[in-house]
Amino acid sequence: MTVEESKKRKLTDDVAIKQNEKKIKKDKKVKDKKDKKDKKDKKDKKEKKEKKEKKEKNDKKDKKDKKDKKAEQVDKLSETTEQPSKQVKIGAYVENEELSKQPQSVIDEFFKENEVSVEDPSKLNLRPLLAFNQISLDKEVQNEIAKFPKPTPIQAVSWPYLLSGKDVIGVAETGSGKTFAFGVPAINNLLTSSSKPKGIKVLVISPTRELASQIYDNLVLLTQKVGIDCCVVYGGVPKDDQRRQIAKSNVVVATPGRLLDLIEEGSVDLSPVDYMVLDEADRMLEKGFEEDIKRIIGQTKSKDRQTLMFTATWPKEVRELASTFMKEPVKVSIGNRDELSANKRITQIVEVVDPRSKERKLLDLLKKYQSGPKKNDKVLIFALYKKEASRVERNLNYNGYKVAAIHGDLSQQQRTQALNEFKSGKSNLLLATDVAARGLDIPNVKTVINLTFPLTVEDYVHRIGRTGRAGQTGTAHTLFTEQEKHLAGGLVNVLNGANQPVPEDLIKFGTHTKRKEHGAYGAFFKDIDMSKKPKKITFD
C-alpha cells in the first residue's frame, strides 16, 4: 500500500469515526430528549392522578358538607316553621298570644303574597297582624275595625310598630287602607292615655282639600263614639268656624297653607302634638310644600313626637325629607315601589285616536260602560285642564248625562257637593282634572276614562288607581293621541309591567322615553332648567 493510499484510507476512517461519533451523539440527544419527555409525562400523569384524587376527595367532602348543611337548614326550618315565636312586648304593644303561635311559614307566606318588605333599623322584626282579633285595642275602636274582613297589608305590618311608638314610613299604592293604618293607633293612644288629652295631640297634614276632607270623614268614624273631637281645616272657606273647631279638637287634619295661616295669626298651638302624619308626602313635595312642611314641623316638639309618613312613591326628595325629622323610622313597602307600576287588578285598555274624535269617542264609551247591568256603575272621567273639563261637562249635560264635576273653575262648596253626589250615587259620572287624581277614596269606581292623557306617566298610574281599590277589580280606558307620543315608551313599560296588552298603534310611536312634555300644552315645568340665569344683552 502506498503512502498516498494509506493517507487516503486514514482520512476515510477519520471521517467515518467522526460521523459515527456524531450519530452516537445525536442518538444520545434523542434518547435524552425522549427520556426527559417520558419523565415529564410520568410526572404529569402522577400529578394529574394526585389532582384527580384530591378533587374526588374534596368533592366527596363538599358533598358531605352540603348534605350536613342541608340537614341543619331543614332542622332550623323545622324549628322556625313549626315552633311558635316567643311573645313580644315593646312599649305599649304586646304581641297577641295567637299571633305568637303562628308558624313562621304562615308569616313568610303573608310577606311573599303581598310583596311586603320591611326595613327595620332596630331589628324588632314584629310580626304582621293576620286578623283583627290578634290585636288588643280600645273596645270602641275594635268594634269599628271589626266591620272589615281583615287588616290590609299596610295596616297589618305598620300597626305593631306604631303601637310600639316607632316612627314609620309607609310606601303603598293609594286605596291600600292608609288612613286607618295611621288613624287606628292614633285614636287608640288617645283613649288608652293615663291622662285626658289637652290641645292638639294628633296632626295630619294632607296636600289637598278633598283628601283632607276624606281623611277627616274616616277618622270621625273612630272618634265620634268615644268623645274625642276631630276637625278639618283647609283654604277656600272662612276661618272663623275653623278657629272655633280647632280650639277644642285633639285631632286635626289640615292642608299646609291654611294651617300656616292659623299658626302665624296665633290661632293654633302645635307644641302638644305627639303624633304627626304626613299623608301623600310625595305629592306635597310635588306641589312645592316642602318649606311649609318644615315650618309646621318646627312648631312641634321633636323629642316627644312620633312621626309617620305615607307616600305612593319613594323618590330622593321624599327620602331626604324623612331623614331630617324622623327617628330611625321603620320603612314598610307594599308591592314593588322602586319601579313605577300599576295595580294589576285593573284592566287597562289604551286606544290611539285622532284628537278631534275624542269627545265623540267618550260618548261611545259611556254607552259601553253604563248600559244594561252596568247602568249604575260609577265612572270617573279625567280631563287635563279646567277649560277642557268645563267644555266636556257642557257637552255631557247636552247629551242627557247627569255629571258631577270637580275642577278649578268651581268653588270649594261646589266641588264638595259634586263629590258627595258621586259618592252617594245621585250622579254616577264624575268629571275631574288632576286635582282628584290622587288620594281621593271614592268607593266602588268601576271605570276610569282618561279623555286626555296626563302630563306624566306617573300621573297616569295615579289616575287609574281610583279604581280597583281595596281588593276589587276595575277598568281603565285611555284615549291616546299623537300629541302624547313622547310618553308612549313609559306607558308601554307600565302596561307590560302589569301584564296588559299593548296596542300596535302605541308601539309605532316608539318605546323609548323622552322628557316630560305635552304636545298640546308644552313642556312639563320640572324639566325646564330654572337654574339658568337670563343672558344679559348689551348694545354697542
Swiss-Prot record:
Annotated Helicase C-terminal domain residues: 361-510
Question: Matching Pfam families, A to Z?
Answer: DEAD (PF00270), Helicase_C (PF00271)
Q: What is its main location?
A: nucleus
Q: Which UniProt keywords apply?
A: ATP-binding, Helicase, Hydrolase, Nucleotide-binding, Nucleus, Ribosome biogenesis, RNA-binding, rRNA processing
Q: Which residues form the Helicase ATP-binding domain?
A: 159-332
Spell out the reaction equation it catalyses: ATP + H2O = ADP + phosphate + H(+)
Spell out the subcellular localization from the entry: Nucleus, Nucleolus
Determine the domain of life of the protein's source. Answer: Eukaryota
In Gene Ontology terms, what is a biological process of this protein?
A: endonucleolytic cleavage in ITS1 upstream of 5.8S rRNA from tricistronic rRNA transcript (SSU-rRNA, 5.8S rRNA, LSU-rRNA)
Q: What would you give as a GO molecular function for this chain, any one?
A: RNA helicase activity
Where are stretches of biased composition, namely Basic and acidic residues? 1-35, 53-62, 68-79
This enzyme's EC code(s):
3.6.4.13
Tell me the residue numbers annotated for binding ATP. Answer: A172, E173, T174, G175, S176, G177, K178, T179
Enzyme class, top EC level, equals hydrolase
Instruction: Output a single Gene Ontology CC term carried by this record.
Output: preribosome, large subunit precursor
Can you quote the domain comment? The Q motif is unique to and characteristic of the DEAD box family of RNA helicases and controls ATP binding and hydrolysis.
This chain's protein is named ATP-dependent RNA helicase DBP3
What organism, scientifically named, is this protein from? Candida glabrata (strain ATCC 2001 / BCRC 20586 / JCM 3761 / NBRC 0622 / NRRL Y-65 / CBS 138) (Yeast)
